[in-house]
Amino acid sequence: MKISISWLREFLPNFSCETVSLVERLTFLGFEVEGVEESASLDRRIVVGRVLETEPHPNAERLTLCLVDVGREEPLRIVCGAPNVRAGMVVPVATEKAKLQFPDGQTLTIKPSKIRGERSQGMICAADELGLSNDHSGVMELESSWEIGKPFADYLESDVVLDIAVTPNRPDVLSHLGIARELADGAPLQYPSQQSLTYQPAGERIAINDAVACPYYTGVIIRGVTIRESPEWLRKRLQAIGLNPKNNIVDITNYMLHALGQPMHAFDCAKLAGERIAVRSDCQAEVVALNNLTYKVEGGMPVICDGSGAIAAIAGVMGGMASAVTESTTDIFLESALFHPSMVRRTAKKLALASDSSYRFERGVDSRMVQQASATAVALILELAGGTVECAMEQGSVAADLQLLALRPERTNKLLGTALSGEQMVELLERIGFRCVEQTTEQLLFAVPSFRVDVTAEIDLIEEVARLYGYNAIESSRQMATIYPTKRQHPAYFPDFLRGELITLGFREILTNPLIKRNDAALASEQLVDVLNPISEGLEVLRPSLLPGLLKVISHNIRHGNRDQKLFEVAHVFEAKPQVQQTQQPLEGYCEQERLVMAITGSRYLRRWNHPTDMVDFYDLSGAVEMLLEQLNILDKSVVNIYTPSALSIDVFLTEKGKRTTHRLGIMQPVNAAWLKHFDIEQEVYCAELDVALLERCYQPTSAYEPPSRFPVVERDISFIIPEGVSAQSLVELVQSSNPLIKTVTVFDRFERNHESGKECSIALSLTIADAKATLQDEKINDILATISRNAESKLGAVIRQV
C-alpha cells in the first residue's frame, strides 16, 4: 500500500519527520516499509518561460516556431510540436544542457539542434516529459503569475511516497487516515469537510435481499453533475500512489478509498432501471466489469442489481460497464456500503478478480465510516462537479454499541515483563482511538473503536500495549527467558517437529489419557505400573503402550460415522521393572519411554463415482512409515525384517565410535483380531509404534546438497537370481555401495518360480549412473556392471539372470 506524505498532512497539518526516522518509527509500530519513492528532482535548467510569438514551421505542417522568453537578454527560438502551444502561454522550458528523464527510464540531454531545417535552442515540455504524469496531449500551461526564468522545480511540491506492507489483521491502516491515526500520538486529526446529510429509510428504492452479504447500504442521488477532468491537486494525489485519473466523479471515489479506507462506487442514474438498487446473492448471469472483461456470476456471489434485475456491479469487487459513469452522465447514484468479508473474498477468488475495493472488504472495513465517507464524497462532488443532492437513503443497520474489553494491568505486566501503571496503559491505548470507560485497580474497561475489527480479546489489547510502548523499550528479563534442555538440538523440540512431519503426511493428532483401564493395559504388557491412589475406577494403571488409547479413539469415531481414519500420537509409555518392588522405590520401579504410534483404517479414497472403494492395507501403512523416515533422512540406513508371522520390525543402523550397531526402531503390523474385538472394531486397522528417542538420535537435520551432473545420465536394468533367505534390501545396498557413480537403485520387478533345485527368486533392479566430471563411456559402464556382478555373487550368492 502506497502512502503519500503530503497527503498524510491533510490529516496531520503539523506533521514533520525525516524520512529515515519515519520509516524506523513505522517499522517499530509493526508496519514494514518495503520501498521509499521521492518525487523526482527536476534539473534546475528547466525554467519557467513565456511564449512571445508563434508562427508555422515552413517545412512541417505539425510543427510551430516559437519565440520564448526565459528571463535572458535574448529570447530562445524553439521548435515545438504540441497542438496547444500559443502566444502568451507560460510554459516549462528545458534549456541547453538540461537533462530530462522519461517514465521508461530513458534520459535526454537538451542541446541546440536543427529540426526540419530550423534552429531550436531548447524544448517546451509536456507533463510526461517531466515525469509528472502520463499526459502527452500538449505542453503544460503554468500559472501566469509565475516568475519568468525561475527554476520550475521551485514551484513543485516535493513529496515522499512510502510502500508499506500491511498484515492481513490490520485493515484499519489501509488508508492515509489509518496511518495518520498511528502517527498522531494523540494529536487531533483534521478530517475533510462533509456535506450535511440526513439519511432517510430507503423504502423500495434500496432492497437488501441478503442481509448477511450486505448488512448496511447507503445511497445518495445527485442531479445535474458535470463530468470533467479533476483539478490538478486531486490528480496529483492519485498519481502519487500510482493511480491514473479518469474523471472527477471516479477520481473522488478512488480518493475516498485511499484517504478514508471506505470503498465507494458511483452509478449513472440513467442506466439504473427505475433508479432502484437491490443487493442479491442469487443471480446467475454474465456481467462486463469496468475492466472490459466478462465474468460469470453464480449463486452465492453478492451483486448489485437495478430495478429490472440486471447486474450493475459485483458487490464489493468492481462496478459494471452497463452502469458506468461517462462524459454524458448528469445524474449519479453514490454507493457507500458494508459487505461481508468472506463473501467478497469468495467472489473475488472464484472470479479471479481482485481490486482495491475487494482487498479492503475482504479484511473488514469500519462500519461507522460508511456514512462519514459518503458525506465527505458528496461535499467533494458538489465542489468539483456541481449538482444538487436529491436524497440520501439507507437500508439495514450497523451495531449501535462498541465492543467492550477488559484489560488487567497485572497480567499485562506479567506477560510483557514491564512495570507499567494503569494510567500509562490508558494513555497508550487512547492514542489510537480506544476509550477507557471504567478504571479500577484490578482492570481497565475499554471501548474498542469500530475500525479495529482485529481486537476481540484481552490478549489483543496486551499486544497493542506492547506495540505502542515499543518492543525495543521492554528490558530483557532472565525470568522471561525460556531455557530448553541442553541436549536439544535443531529442531528445538523434536516431538513437535515430528508432529509437523506427520501432519504433512495427512495424519491427525490425538491426545489420550496416560491413565487407562487395567484390562486394556493387560493386552499390551504384563509389567504394569499401578497408580497408588487412582482418581477413579478405570484409571488405575499407566499405559504400557499407546495402542489401547488409539484403538479406543478409532472405535469411538467409527460409532459416530467416521470409518476412514489416519491418526497418530506422540506421548510417553510406562512399564514396570519386575526386579524392583514398586511400593519400596516407586520412582525406580518403572521405565518411561516416548513413543510414536500411527494407525490407518477404512477406505483408501473418498467414496466417488470414479474411484474404487478399496480399503487400506498393510502397504499403505508401510508407505507412510517409509515417507516419514525419508523426511527424517533415516530411510537409507533402515531395514525392514520379519518380527513375527504377522508383524515386521524396522531396524536402523547407527555408527558410533567407529562401530556399527543395529537398533530396533519399532514394529508395523495389522492389529490382531483379539484387540479389535476387545475395542468393538469390525474393520481392519494397521498400526506402527516407533521409538521417538531413537528417531531423534538417527535424525539428520540437513542433507548435503549435490548438484545434478552436467553430463548425460545413464540408466541400466539388471536382474539377479538370489538364493532363498537373501532380502532384496541387502541386494540393493550391495549394488549401491559398489561404485560412487551409482546414484539410485530401485526394485522394479520380483518374480518367483519353482525350479528343479528348489524355489527360484528373481529381483530386477533399475540403476541410475552419473559422473559429475565427464561423460560416461561404454567401457566405464561395463566395468561398473562387472563389479556389481562379482560383488553380488561373492557376497550374496546372487547371479545375473540369463535371458
Swiss-Prot record:
Species per Swiss-Prot/TrEMBL record: Chlorobium chlorochromatii (strain CaD3)
PROSITE patterns cross-referenced by the UniProt entry: B5 (PS51483), FDX_ACB (PS51447), TRBD (PS50886)
Description of how the protein assembles with itself and partners: Tetramer of two alpha and two beta subunits.
GO biological process terms, semicolon-separated: phenylalanyl-tRNA aminoacylation
Reactions accelerated catalytically: tRNA(Phe) + L-phenylalanine + ATP = L-phenylalanyl-tRNA(Phe) + AMP + diphosphate + H(+)
One GO CC term, this protein: phenylalanine-tRNA ligase complex
Protein name stated in the entry: Phenylalanine--tRNA ligase beta subunit
Domain FDX-ACB: 709-801
Transcription regulation as UniProt keyword: no
Keyword Transport in annotation: no
Chief location of this protein within or outside the cell: cytoplasm
Pfam families recorded: B3_4 (PF03483), B5 (PF03484), FDX-ACB (PF03147), tRNA_bind (PF01588), tRNA_synthFbeta (PF17759)
Bound cofactor: record note: Binds 2 magnesium ions per tetramer.
SMART domains the record matches: B3_4, B5, FDX-ACB
Annotated Mg(2+) binding sites: 454, 460, 463-464
HAMAP family linked: Phe_tRNA_synth_beta1
Ranges of residues in domain tRNA-binding: 40-153
Subcellular location: Cytoplasm
Matches recorded under CDD domains: PheRS_beta_core, tRNA_bind_bactPheRS
Swiss-Prot/TrEMBL cofactor(s): Mg(2+)
